[in-house]
C-alpha cells in the first residue's frame, strides 16, 4: 500500500507500533494479495486459461489446470521456474483465493488437477476485513472516475499532498451517492475504512473527524501487480519508491514534479473491475454480484459470459403476449454494505443469472430465471445486460425492480 505520503517521522505514533502495527501490516498484506489475485484471475479469463473443463463426463466450470497454469506463469515471466510458480499459487491458496475444485488437495501441485478461483464459484469467504476492503476498492474506483473531482491536490500545515479529500466533503459525497443514508452512517463507514487501513489522515496525525482535515487512500488499487511480489515479506508500501508514478506522497513547496498516479498503461494492462459481491460483476464467474456502488472506470471491463441458466431463449415479445405463462413481480431491494446480491445477464430481455442466497435480493424474493422488466420505473425489456448493469450501478442504493417469472419455472 502507498503511504499517504510522509518521508519523515511526522505523524508516527503508538498506533503504528507493537501489536497494532503488526495488525496493520497484516491487513495491508491481505489487501495486496487480494488485488494481485484478482488481477491474475481477470488476466487468466482474458487469455482463456480459465474455462469450462470436462473430466469423466462431468463438466467443471471456470477452472484451470495446475500444470498448464505453471507453464503459463513461466512463459509470461510471472515466475522464474516451476518451484517458484508453485510457491506463488500456494500463497493464493493459503489466503482462500483459489482451491481445488473438489477441495481434496490443500497443496497446489504441479499436476493435471483442476483448480478454481473462489470468486468464480461463489465460495470466497467474506469476513469483515474482506468486506471493508471491497467497499474501499469500490469507493476508490468511483472517486477515480474522470467526472469525479473530489480527489484534489491540497495543502495542510504548509505541506502539499496529492489525491486528497476533505473529510466533510467526503461525508457529503457518501450521502449524496447513496453510500450512506445519513451523515452519521457515512462517518461510521469512514471509521471502518480507517480501522482497516484503507484511508488515513495525510500525515497520520488524526483519526477520521468530520472536519476540514485531509485524508487519502493508502492503496493504489489500479497499480499492476507482479505475482512475484507475493514472495516479498516486506511491507507493501516499501515496494514503491517515491519515484514511482503510482506512489502517493506529499510534496513540499519546491518545483519537483508530481508523479502521483500518472496515467501509465503497460502493455496488456489489466482492466480492473471493482464492482463486486463475491465476484466481479462483469467477470466470467456465474456467481458475480452487483455491488452497492458503481464502476465508472474509463476502461471497458474484461467480459466473458457464463453459460445461461435459461432452459431456452425467450424474447420480449413472448413475455408481452396476452395470456403468456408469466407472472409479474416487483421487488424493493436495499443494498447492504457489500451489495445487492444478484447477477443480470442476457439481452432483450435480460434475466437473473445468479442470486446470492444470503444477499438482499434473495431476501426480497428474487430468483434465477426471472426476466427483468424495469429498474426504478424505466423499462429495460429491449436493452442488453450491460445497459441494465450500468443503470443499477449508477443508481441509488435502493432499487425497485419489476420482473416476470415463468409460472412453470
Curated annotation (Swiss-Prot):
User: Which SMART domains does the record match to this protein?
Assistant: DEP (SM00049), PDZ (SM00228)
Cysteines joined through disulfide linkages: none
Report the gene name: DEPTOR
Modified after translation how? Phosphorylation weakens interaction with MTOR within mTORC1 and mTORC2. Phosphorylated at Ser-286, Ser-287 and Ser-291 in response to mitogenic stimulation by MTOR: DEPTOR is either directly phosphorylated by MTOR or indirectly via proteins kinases that are activated by MTOR, such as CK1/CSNK1A1. Phosphorylation at Ser-286, Ser-287 and Ser-291 promotes ubiquitination by the SCF(BTRC) complex, followed by degradation. Phosphorylation at Ser-235 by MAPK3/ERK1 promotes deubiquitination by USP7, enhancing its stability.
The name this protein carries in UniProt is: DEP domain-containing mTOR-interacting protein
Pinpoint motif BetaTrCP degron motif by residue range: 286-291
How does this protein assemble?
A: Associated component of the mechanistic target of rapamycin complex 1 (mTORC1) which contains MTOR, MLST8 and RPTOR. Associated component of the mechanistic target of rapamycin complex 2 (mTORC2) which contains MTOR, MLST8, PROTOR1, RICTOR, MAPKAP1 and DEPTOR. Interacts (via PDZ domain) with MTOR; interacts with MTOR within both mTORC1 and mTORC2. Interacts (via PDZ domain) with MINAR1 (via N-terminus). Interacts with SIK3.
Q: Which residues carry this modification: Phosphothreonine?
A: 241, 259, 295
What outcome is documented for mutating residue 282 to A in this protein?
Answer: In mutant 13A; abolished phosphorylation, leading to promote interaction with MTOR without affecting ability to bind phosphatidic acid
* Chief location of this protein within or outside the cell: membrane
